[in-house]
Amino acid sequence: MATIVQDIAIESGADDVWDAVRDVGAVHERLVPGYVLDVRMDGDTRYLTVPGGAVVRELIVSVDDDLRRLAYSAVEGFRIPLTHHHASFQVFPEGDGHCRLIWTTDVLPHEMIDQVRPRVVRGAQVMKETLEQRAGR
């Protein structure tokens, strides 16, 4: 399994960042506006509409407020031929008004890592910009 880890330093408090991350039905508004266009929830299943109109179906695996950790798995609607996708976000406080957001993504087949990595890197950039802008930074 190939793994991508994004360690994102964010100029915003951990509680505020976690509140946005855990709001799984509003990622298109609170985390990655423009990168995800719309979200529809059906229980623990999230449907993301992305630019171009594709719909990605994800299972929300865990939302752990104590650990500030969200785990999810994309299971359908890939633009690239993946057989497995699992990812997690975890927020760590780093002093007043700062935190780290660790985004870990595992994919199969291994060979797809070079196609997945730029999407994750861009998503991390959009998240950082969005969260810091909302924090007034």
Where are these regions (language model features)?
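Hydrophobic ligand-binding cavity/cleft-lining segments
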Residues: 1-40
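A general secondary-structure signal for short beta-strands and their flanking turns/coil
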Residues: 1-3, 53, 67, 84, ...
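Hydrophobic/aromatic beta-strand elements that line small-molecule binding cavities or substrate pockets
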Residues: 6-8, 56-62, 85-93
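Short beta-strand-to-loop capping motifs
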Residues: 10-12, 50, 105-107
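Glycine-rich portal/gate segments that line the openings of hydrophobic small-molecule binding cavities
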Residues: 26-80, 102, 133-137
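Beta-strand/loop substructures that line and gate deep hydrophobic ligand-binding cavities in soluble
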Residues: 77-129
